[in-house]
Structures are given as C-alpha cells and as structure tokens.
C-alpha cells in the first residue's frame, strides 16, 4: 500500500470530501485506512466491566484507500506515490509532482 500510519492524507470522495487528517491505522488485508476526524460514526455500547457507563460513542470508521490521497510534505499538495530504488538498493516513496523522496519503504 502507498499509505502508511502517520501520513497526512486528503479525502477525495464521499461525505468528508476535502478534509485532511492523519492516518491512525492501516488495514492492508481489507485495503482500508482509518483517518482521524474523518468518517465519524456513532456506536451504541452497553455497560461492561471496562466501561461502567454505556451510551453512544463517536469513533472514526475505515475508508477505502482509493478514497484518500497522500499529501506530500515537501510541496503540500495531494499526489500519487511512485516507488523507486536508490543506488544503494533501498526502496523509497517519491512524490510524482515534485519528485522529492517522501520516505523509505
């Protein structure tokens, strides 16, 4: 997957289109990501030993990875990610707009 935990992403479709947020977790088997402050759902819970009080809890739900786009830390624009190899053999993620290295994979 092109997106990793801690990346800043932009939502490009759906009810939260245009919102930015950090990736909280990545679910590669389902091809989904959880972004903080985006796709908030209300979950009804019963009282348990951990949570003495039941009620309605708001939490972020996963989004399909095709609905988010990585924001390059160098040019601060949403971009696609290319994977290239350096001379020493390391694989890195590269911004397709400004050609800067985002980080190593």
Swiss-Prot record:
GO biological processes: translation
Keywords: Ribonucleoprotein, Ribosomal protein, RNA-binding, rRNA-binding
InterPro entries according to UniProt: KOW, Rib_uL2_dom2, Ribosomal_uL24, Ribosomal_uL24_CS, Ribosomal_uL24_KOW, Translation_prot_SH3-like_sf
GO-annotated molecular function: rRNA binding; structural constituent of ribosome
Cellular component, GO annotation: cytosolic large ribosomal subunit
UniProt key word rRNA-binding: yes
Cytoplasm in keyword set: no
Subunit structure: Part of the 50S ribosomal subunit.
Homology family: Belongs to the universal ribosomal protein uL24 family.
Protein purpose: One of two assembly initiator proteins, it binds directly to the 5'-end of the 23S rRNA, where it nucleates assembly of the 50S subunit. One of the proteins that surrounds the polypeptide exit tunnel on the outside of the subunit.
Name this polypeptide is given: Large ribosomal subunit protein uL24
Protein's organism: Dictyoglomus turgidum (strain DSM 6724 / Z-1310)
């Amino acid at each position: 997957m092109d997106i990793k935990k801690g990346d800043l992403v932009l939502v490009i479709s759906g009810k939260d289109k245009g919102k930015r947020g950090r990736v909280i977790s990545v679910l590669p088997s389902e091809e989904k990501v959880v972004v903080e402050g985006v796709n908030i759902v209300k979950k009804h819970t019963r009282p348990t030993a951990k949570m003495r009080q039941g009620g309605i809890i708001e939490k972020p739900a996963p989004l399909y990875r095709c609905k988010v786009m990585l924001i390059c830390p160098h040019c601060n624009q949403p971009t696609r990610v290319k994977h290239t190899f350096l001379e020493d053999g390391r694989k890195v993620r590269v911004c397709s707009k400004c050609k800067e290295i985002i980080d190593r994979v």
